[in-house]
């Protein structure tokens, strides 16, 4: 069995991605688990800018879930962000069936999309 791509030689004999996925590369005195990033903003010029958009913690989480599911993963900063991402996939003017007992924010967004003619 080859060593995992994250470089954790000590995990090369484990048959589960749950223990290995999303971990940082092995470096002397480096963390075994990814650090939790608590800052809301980052210095310009790198891959991360604003916490709600993206950060290193979310990147590690996506890698881990994607490895466990055998595909790609996208995480969101809130349930409404996830709901809006799904709503953006709805074809223009098509009917949408939703529960009347949904989260109020979801119901309000669906009503707004209906009033704009985006959904039926």
Q: Which residue stretches match the model-derived regions?
A:
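Short conserved active-site loop signatures built around small residues
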Residues: 2-37
């Amino acid at each position: 069995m080859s060593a995992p791509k994250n470089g954790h030689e000590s995990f090369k004999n484990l048959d589960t991605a749950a223990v290995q996925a999303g971990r940082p590369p092995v470096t002397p005195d480096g963390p075994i688990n990814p650090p939790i990033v608590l800052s809301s903003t980052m210095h310009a010029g790198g891959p991360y800018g604003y916490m709600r958009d993206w950060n290193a913690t979310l990147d590690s989480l996506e890698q881990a879930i994607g490895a466990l599911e055998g595909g790609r993963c996208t995480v969101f900063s809130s349930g409404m962000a996830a709901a809006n991402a799904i709503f953006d996939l709805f074809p223009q003017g098509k009917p949408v069936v939703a529960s009347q007992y949904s989260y109020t924010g979801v119901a309000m967004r669906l009503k707004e999309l209906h009033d704009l003619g985006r959904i039926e």
